[in-house]
């Protein structure tokens, strides 16, 4: 089937994508890249989805196989201490603690000054990615971009 789009964004979880992707092939839709959110970043996507998700690209909040040195250092240290692969929660907690410790080491000794110091952070290279804080106090993080190679999720950035 000839379609007039190059990509299809499906904002759902991996469990739904492995049901949707084969339908594209069944209806002879080809040449369409599947785009997804962090809910796709699960080993079952490639195990169950197989060839139907081979061109998929998704955003992820954390990827333990990232090529960024600051992520690899965290993953190695976590593995040494806990004999496990960290998840997004471990990476986020590590980053939160480090952001506070950096402020304390810089001499910020009150709640307000620590908060002000964190608000000024730009481009912090953390385990959960590069983080900057906006004027309104919200964090802006660059997501990890993942693709599918064989039966593995691989870093695209």
Summary of predicted features, one role per range:
Residues 1-157:
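Extracytosolic ligand-binding ectodomains
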């Amino acid at each position: 089937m000839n379609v007039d789009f190059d990509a299809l964004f499906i904002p759902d979880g991996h469990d739904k994508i492995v049901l949707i992707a084969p339908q594209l092939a069944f209806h002879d839709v080809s040449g369409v890249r599947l785009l997804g959110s962090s809910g796709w970043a699960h080993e079952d996507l490639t195990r169950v989805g197989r060839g139907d998700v081979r061109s998929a690209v998704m955003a992820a909040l954390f990827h333990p196989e990232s090529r960024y040195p600051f992520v690899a250092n965290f993953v190695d240290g976590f593995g040494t201490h806990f004999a496990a692969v960290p998840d997004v929660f471990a990476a986020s907690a590590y980053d939160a603690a480090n952001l506070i410790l950096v402020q304390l080491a810089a001499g910020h000794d009150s709640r307000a000054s620590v908060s002000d110091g964190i608000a000024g952070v730009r481009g912090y290279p953390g385990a959960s990615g590069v983080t900057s804080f906006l004027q309104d106090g919200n964090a802006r993080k660059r997501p990890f971009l993942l693709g599918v190679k064989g039966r593995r999720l691989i870093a695209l950035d």
